[in-house]
């Protein structure tokens, strides 16, 4: 699994003050730009992209509809994405597919999309349909994060991931069953076919996230050779 860690500055000075040494063991940086006022995102961008030069960066605008901190119309949402992409060409762009489906046609030329779906209330009954619809579009990554209400919800998310990965071996998935109940899914990526796991450093960006240090210890244990 590749490890993703968020940076969530609320203003330019916070972006400038980020200690990049904390991110040495992280594979990808997710810039959660939704913690900024919409008019400040482009102004803060140089601090992020210059500070993390050499690291792969995910540009994410997580809107309130999917558990984020910014309210945007779909057109505002896609316009900010386009502006950031035109200037900085981030390695990945997170696109909230079902929330902003009306402007998805404007994203068809983007080769680096993470099509994402977040549900902080439940694991919906139509989860398999969500997997299917996004997988058919063949983005760089299909990301699904849902909240379990039962152990079966956790198993369903993991089983769907394994099934879709088996049928679509070239497609990358990043799937999460959130909260304490779903934490197992964050550690099982290599088994179920989820390529990325999201961790926290200074601040948690999703329910059930573990710290980078804890994740490193867990991965070390999972990879131990225990043969006699």
UniProtKB/Swiss-Prot annotation:
Amino-acid biosynthesis among keywords: yes
PANTHER family, sorted: 3-DEHYDROQUINATE DEHYDRATASE
Family, similarity comment: Belongs to the type-I 3-dehydroquinase family.
InterPro entries with a match to the protein in the record: Aldolase_TIM, DHquinase_I, Type-I_3-dehydroquinase
MF (Gene Ontology): 3-dehydroquinate dehydratase activity
HAMAP family tied to this protein: AroD
Subunit structure of this chain's protein: Homodimer.
EC number from the UniProt entry: 4.2.1.10
Any one Pfam family match given in the protein's UniProt record, by short name: DHquinase_I
Catalytic activity: 3-dehydroquinate = 3-dehydroshikimate + H2O
The organism of origin for this protein: Streptococcus pyogenes serotype M1
Catalytic residues (UniProt): 118 (proton donor/acceptor), 143 (schiff-base intermediate with substrate)
Protein origin, superkingdom: Bacteria
Binding site for 3-dehydroquinate: 30-32, 62, 186, 205, 209
Function of the molecule: Involved in the third step of the chorismate pathway, which leads to the biosynthesis of aromatic amino acids. Catalyzes the cis-dehydration of 3-dehydroquinate (DHQ) and introduces the first double bond of the aromatic ring to yield 3-dehydroshikimate.
Protein name in UniProt: 3-dehydroquinate dehydratase
Entry's Gene Ontology BP terms: 3,4-dihydroxybenzoate biosynthetic process; amino acid biosynthetic process; aromatic amino acid family biosynthetic process; chorismate biosynthetic process
């Amino acid at each position: 699994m590749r490890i993703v860690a968020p940076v969530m500055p609320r203003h330019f000075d916070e972006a400038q003050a980020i200690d990049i040494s904390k991110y040495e063991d992280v594979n990808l940086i997710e810039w959660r730009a939704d913690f900024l006022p919409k008019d400040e995102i482009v102004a803060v961008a140089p601090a992020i992209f210059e500070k993390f030069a050499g690291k792969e960066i995910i540009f994410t605008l997580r809107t309130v509809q999917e558990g984020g901190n910014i309210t945007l119309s779909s057109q505002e949402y896609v316009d900010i994405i386009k502006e950031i992409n035109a200037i900085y060409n981030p390695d990945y762009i997170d696109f909230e597919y079902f929330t902003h489906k009306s402007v998805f046609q404007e994203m068809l030329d983007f080769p680096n999309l993470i099509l994402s779906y977040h549900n902080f209330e439940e694991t919906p009954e139509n989860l398999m349909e969500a997997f299917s619809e996004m997988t058919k579009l063949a983005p760089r990554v299909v990301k699904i994060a849902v909240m379990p209400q039962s152990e079966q919800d956790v198993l369903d998310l993991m089983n769907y991931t394994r099934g879709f990965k088996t049928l679509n071996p070239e497609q990358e998935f990043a799937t999460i069953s959130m909260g304490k109940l779903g934490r197992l899914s964050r550690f099982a990526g290599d088994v179920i076919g989820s390529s990325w796991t999201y961790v926290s450093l200074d601040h948690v960006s999703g329910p059930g996230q573990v710290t980078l240090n804890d994740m490193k210890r867990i991965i070390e244990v999972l990879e131990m050779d225990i043969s006699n």
